[in-house]
């Protein structure tokens, strides 16, 4: 009886020993997806298998797509443990790799263990990448664009109405709606949609951080072009940027834990403060010009529309140039979420403002401020918090949202102007000539 029981135990143990994994990656933490950026990469595979004869085991690397990966050589190092160093030449794309451990005894070879269908993604960090190398722009062109931006913000300062500021101070409902949507509703929607679409953790975190960004300069620019309340838009942008110093670290901590991402997340305080100063200083100059030199303020107000349109197209061009390398990594789900994020911000802002019976220009402004996000603050958080290549993968989100929101707003502007044209021509025909 005891002999039969001992044999039964051996039968239980033997299959377990046969299924023991002898291979493991030594220099890679995330084995679900290997991400490479350089033209040549090395991976180290450790084998815990004890050779029956000296140097009888070897590693075979099988590549699914040789256009993405090519094996240069495999080097075996046997000291206390056995390591195989696989030298690979990489090309942009995705493929699968299978690693097999074989043992050779004379003419007979035996498969000992294998790591099947390990997913590999290769992408390049070219000069198009904002993070690795800036776009090469002539210094004179750079100074011209910078001067245009400062002049444009100064002109916006000339359009600030103190009566509107007093009204908002007494009834801050539009600002409160913007805060609730930007820092509570939008991050939750970003998290929920990223889970529904099954995005990787890094990309999901990128979208959540993009959704928790404050309003950007595009909000008050489009408030002007779409006949919203410019003063309210500027006030909402400054308020949300100030609150971002508190709300962005809170949301990054909360949602990173929900996504199962550990580590310290850094908030770019200097970048947020500099963004706020970059808005306030030239606009304060515009306010002073309006009160001290009204005639010059009128001239500045005349150029604000053409200047804003010019800067809008320059911004779209630069965003596409910088984001091109990231868009190569974007799939259908990422593009879909990139389109949904600004659209949801516009929808939530306009709908809630309408529910509270706010005037039409105010409804437009709340929608624009919650739909046009300063995505590049999310990019700064990602780059400070993650190591490459995870940071590169997460950076797809803010760039996709930035480009999709620019295209959506441009389309909205064209539709709005096309609808306005017939009504303007009708009003002109009805106007008496005398």
Swiss-Prot record:
Q: Which GO terms describe its molecular function?
A: symporter activity
Topology in the lipid bilayer is annotated as: Multi-pass membrane protein
A single GO CC term, please? Answer: membrane
Q: What is its main location?
A: membrane
Q: Tell me where in or outside the cell this protein is found.
A: Membrane
Family indicated by similarity: Belongs to the bile acid:sodium symporter (BASS) (TC 2.A.28) family.
Q: Which residues are glycosylated?
A: 73, 96
InterPro entries for this protein: BilAc:Na_symport/Acr3, Bilac:Na_transpt, Na+/solute_symporter_sf
Q: Which UniProt keywords apply?
A: Glycoprotein, Ion transport, Membrane, Signal, Sodium, Sodium transport, Symport, Transmembrane, Transmembrane helix, Transport
Provide the leader sequence positions.
1-18
Q: Which GO terms describe its biological process?
A: sodium ion transport
- Which residues face the membrane's Cytoplasmic side? 151-172, 227-232, 290-306, 353-365, 417-434
Q: PANTHER family from the xrefs?
A: SODIUM-BILE ACID COTRANSPORTER, SODIUM_BILE ACID COTRANSPORTER 5
List the ranges whose topology is Extracellular. 19-129, 194-203, 256-268, 328-331, 387-395
Provide the transmembrane region boundaries. 130-150, 173-193, 204-226, 233-255, 269-289, 307-327, 332-352, 366-386, 396-416
The protein in question is named Sodium/bile acid cotransporter 5
Question: Which Gene3D superfamilies is this protein grouped with?
Answer: 1.20.1530.20
Which Pfam family would be a valid example here?
NTCP5_P3_N
Q: Does the keyword Signal apply?
A: yes
């Amino acid at each position: 009886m005891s002999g039969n029981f001992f044999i039964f135990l051996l039968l239980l143990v033997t299959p377990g020993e046969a299924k023991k994994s002898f291979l493991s990656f030594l220099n890679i933490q995330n084995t679900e997806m290997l991400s490479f950026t350089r033209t040549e990469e090395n991976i180290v595979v450790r084998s815990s298998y004890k050779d029956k004869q000296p140097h009888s085991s070897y590693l075979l690397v099988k590549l699914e797509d040789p256009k993405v990966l090519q094996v240069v050589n495999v080097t075996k190092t046997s000291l206390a443990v056995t390591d195989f160093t696989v030298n690979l030449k990489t090309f942009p794309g995705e493929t699968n790799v299978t690693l097999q451990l074989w043992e050779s005894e004379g003419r007979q070879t035996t498969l000992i263990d294998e790591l099947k269908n390990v997913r590999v993604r290769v992408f390049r960090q070219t000069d198009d990448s904002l993070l690795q190398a800036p776009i090469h722009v002539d210094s004179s062109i750079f100074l011209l664009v910078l001067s245009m931006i400062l002049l444009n913000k100064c002109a916006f300062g000339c359009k600030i109405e103190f009566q509107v500021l007093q009204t908002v101070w007494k009834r801050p409902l539009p600002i409160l709606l913007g805060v609730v949507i930007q820092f509570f509703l939008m991050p939750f929607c970003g998290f929920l949609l990223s889970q529904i679409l099954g995005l990787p953790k890094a990309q999901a975190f990128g979208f959540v951080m993009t959704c928790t960004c404050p309003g950007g300069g595009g909000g008050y620019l489009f408030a002007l072009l779409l006949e919203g309340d410019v003063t309210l838009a500027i006030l909402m942008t400054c308020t949300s940027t100030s609150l971002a110093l508190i709300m962005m670290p809170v949301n990054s901590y909360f949602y990173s834990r929900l996504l199962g991402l550990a580590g310290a997340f850094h908030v770019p305080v200097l970048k947020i403060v500099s963004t706020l100063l970059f808005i306030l200083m030239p606009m304060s100059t515009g306010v002073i010009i309006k009160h001290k030199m009204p005639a010059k303020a009128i001239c500045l107000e005349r150029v604000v529309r053409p200047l804003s349109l010019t800067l809008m197209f320059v911004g779209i061009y630069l965003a596409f140039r910088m984001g091109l390398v990231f868009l190569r990594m974007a799939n259908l789900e990422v593009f879909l979420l990139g389109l949904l994020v600004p659209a949801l911000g516009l929808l939530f802002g306009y709908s809630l403002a309408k529910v509270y019976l706010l005037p039409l220009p105010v409804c437009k402004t709340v929608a624009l401020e919650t739909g046009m996000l300063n995505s590049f603050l999310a990019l700064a958080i990602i780059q400070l918090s993650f190591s490459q290549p995870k940071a590169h993968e997460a950076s797809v989100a803010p760039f996709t949202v930035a480009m999709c929101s620019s295209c959506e707003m441009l389309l909205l502007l064209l539709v709005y102007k096309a609808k306005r044209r017939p009504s303007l021509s009708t009003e002109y025909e009805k106007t008496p000539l005398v």
